[in-house]
Amino acid sequence: MRADGNLTQWAAPGFPDDTLLLRDIARGGGFVIESVIPSEAKESLVAYFALLPSPEPTYDYIDGAWLTDAPYGVIHRMASYPDVHGIFTAVLDFAAARYAHLRIDTHRDNHIMQHLIEKHNFTYCGIIWLEDGTERLAYER
């Protein structure tokens, strides 16, 4: 993220930390993806994401409007190895098989994630705020 100009998202040392990831896993929503890293030619852990059921407390207030009030799945903490392609598509396929409606948010400076979100037919819905007061761009499909 830093190399692409996103200097502030996940800037806190150790974020996301083990406690948060273990909480995702305990809720049945922490997932890893294994694949072959081209430069290493061996199977490795290449991505992590959380797919959690609604409600998401930080989505209760939005400066804008959600597309629906129906139950949804929310994708959080999407992180992947940069040289392995197709991860986001695989995550969305996995999520869409489980939820009719999906929501996701990202940092204003995370242009790569914004591009991927919009490319995969999400609609920009507005701005939400995290518990620490930082804003995120929010999307739904």
Residue ranges and their predicted role:
Residues 18-32, 54-56:
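A short helix-loop-beta-strand connector motif used in the catalytic cores of GNAT acetyltransferases and
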Residues 50-83:
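Conserved acyl-donor/pantetheine-binding loop and adjacent beta-alpha core of acyl/acetyltransferases
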Residues 74, 97-109:
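Conserved GNAT acetyl-CoA-binding A-motif
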Residues 80-97, 114-119:
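Conserved acetyl-CoA-binding loop-helix of GNAT-fold acetyltransferases
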